[in-house]
């Protein structure tokens, strides 16, 4: 059976390059649909989710090519772009249902074509993850929705600006509004917009294409719609979640690691948590340098939240490390209600974890975990199980590798560069 074999107990030492950001790349690829000119997106990670998104763009009629470490997208340049024909906008299949980020095609195709039909997007099984915020916001912009036979249809006869207040700073909803608003008639104001760096990256790309957006990086965005957009070159920032994963790997195993080109300015909540666990984090022109003792300290209370708070995507990695910390820690999950799924496999390794409800986990650190056979059921939890295996005594084997490959270019190669005994088999 395909999986990842790990011989644990080795400290991590050395330097690893951090890949481009998955969560920035995907909405930017969607945004390339808003112009007829070619765009070149540099520093794209070669991960499963990006390959799936490229497949979707090609199905819509775009010419998409990998060039060195980037992707060239040519959506127009022909008399009739197929995505402007209704039959080509019925998006189905694993690329849609297996990837939550496919939802950003909703705003992009409404902005370009005014109509789209797609299966409900999927992704990792970590809660209900409703799309009501997206639908309610776009309805205010003149979009009509119809749900039938598992398909979501959206049509906008007159896509127009609106004043939209988000009751929660949803990254996906903010991105979908942005993608639709830059092509809408009039101005759109988003109050309560998400502050995540990936939203800022999308705004930067759109403005590089000629869009007019005020308030970038703030909770209120003003989009002046109706601008003609053009192609551009843009470099995707590095992935703060991948950097955080390897940071926690270093803390769990002990050692010293240079996270080359890590976006440390976007990782303050993560480095604060790391230092509470006993690590030392130092920034330089090269990136983020992490030194960790042999055994981490308990953190007391750690809660996830929207940026700039501690990211939910690193909660599982933190849990894996805290199972080996001195003392008792409590994790409070405030984004998704079902993100403690790795607790059971960790307990199978000897961890002491008590789940109070779907939101709280109390962890009493043990001195050592023991190697085990585990199954990854989602992206970030799968990566966290790899970290647990690295720190455990003996051999571990993690199946469900395809989940991990959705977000990590080559986690085994990267960790081997740091001295880990890990191989994909």
Regions found by a protein language model. Give the residues of each.
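Short, structured segments at the rim of ligand-binding sites
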Residues: 1-425
